[in-house]
Amino acid sequence: QAYEDSIRTPSLSFIEAMGTPLRSELSPHFVAVSKKIGGSLMRVYRDTRFAKDKTPYKTNVGIQFRHELGKDVHAPGFYLHIEPGNCFFGTGIWRPESAYLHKIREFIVDNPRSWSGILSQKNFSSDWRLIGATLIRPPRGFDPDHKLIVDLKRKDFIAHRNFSDSEIYRTDFVDFAINNYKQCSDYMSYLCMALEVEY
């Protein structure tokens, strides 16, 4: 009951409140689904099948506003992570299938100036950084000396921005979230173009 009252219910209320501004201020193609199971709120249970740590529950709240064509966490999305000492916003795509990953890499090769321009935008470069897994060697079929090889080696295309725990209690947290995601609008639009889905 404590989980229901202090975590799930307020999380679902936040998701519901995000629906209209998400569509009107960011993109009509990303969805906020306020459901206990199968919606934007990620499950509290950990997958312990291959983990040494068998603790059954996560210590964070994860919320993903994914693209309408996406079925799971591997779809492009706007993400919110709430955990004591580690609260952050995320934007992009996590562990895309190999075919989608190849599309993104090819798009960067074909449109390098746009990619570099987005990453150097002041409101993006000052507050956000790209995180995630990368290959040790250059991906097959791509020039190892390409000027953007660091980005071409990425396995995740996630932009990440931390914020303090106290921000969670802001009365305007919905606006705070939307304004942060807006800083990544061009970044998300670029990834959607690479994947040939609407933004």
Predicted stretch roles:
Residues 78-81, 121-125:
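Short, highly charged low-complexity linear segments
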Residues 2, 29, 90, 103-104, ...:
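Short, hydrophobic/aromatic alpha-helical segments in well-folded domains
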Residues 28-57, 126-140:
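A short, surface-exposed loop/turn module that caps and links secondary-structure elements
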Residues 1-44:
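Active-site acidic/histidine clusters and adjacent loop/turn architecture
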Residues 1, 10-23, 108, 113, ...:
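Long, solvent-exposed, polar/charged low-complexity segments
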Residues 45-109:
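Aromatic- and glycine-enriched beta-alpha-beta binding-site module
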Residues 41, 60, 156:
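A residue-level signal for beta-strand positions that form part of recognition/binding surfaces
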